[in-house]
């Protein structure tokens, strides 16, 4: 289906009449990202500590009651990456990294006022991946992450301990 509605010009979709190269003066570069391998991991983690910052509204009255928490973006920040090629398996490597995911926590304070705060979760990954041969253009390792914490308990100060469901795709 075409969304081209003006048929008055010869530079539009449709049958080619005459020289198809007539009028072509633009060059277009299309860049695509090649994915060599991906690893999906789905887990339930208990005892994850969320240290809260950036309260809205500010200065809540403690103790806080946990309502929910979830990741604010699906892109994890990959740090502390270490790639060790496997000598017995060509183009495979052990990939170790820390993936940090920003979180938004919803709570009520001691006065019953609902608020939100920011936190983050750092997850250590240790996986085997297919990686390309060394080249001039380096490859990257990315993480797509979703974290949902349906339950948690107040510890002290601005801190919760939560149980969360994590889905992570390393590619």
Predicted regions and their residues:
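Viral structural modules
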Residues: 1-171
């Amino acid at each position: 289906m075409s969304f081209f509605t003006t048929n008055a010009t010869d530079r539009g979709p449709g049958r080619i009449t005459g020289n198809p190269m007539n009028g072509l003066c633009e060059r277009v570069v299309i860049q695509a990202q090649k994915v060599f391998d991906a690893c999906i991991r789905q887990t339930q983690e208990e005892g994850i500590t969320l240290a809260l910052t950036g309260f809205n509204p500010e200065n809540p009255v403690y103790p806080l009651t946990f309502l929910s928490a979830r990741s604010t973006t699906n892109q994890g920040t990959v740090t502390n990456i270490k790639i060790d090629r496997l000598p017995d398996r060509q183009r495979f490597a052990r990939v170790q990294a820390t993936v940090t995911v920003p979180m938004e926590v919803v709570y009520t304070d001691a006065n019953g006022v609902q608020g939100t705060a920011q936190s983050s979760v750092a997850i250590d990954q240790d996986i085997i991946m297919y990686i390309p041969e060394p080249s001039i253009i380096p490859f990257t390792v990315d993480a797509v992450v979703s974290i949902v914490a349906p339950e948690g308990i107040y510890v002290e100060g601005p801190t919760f301990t939560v149980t969360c469901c994590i889905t992570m795709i390393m590619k």
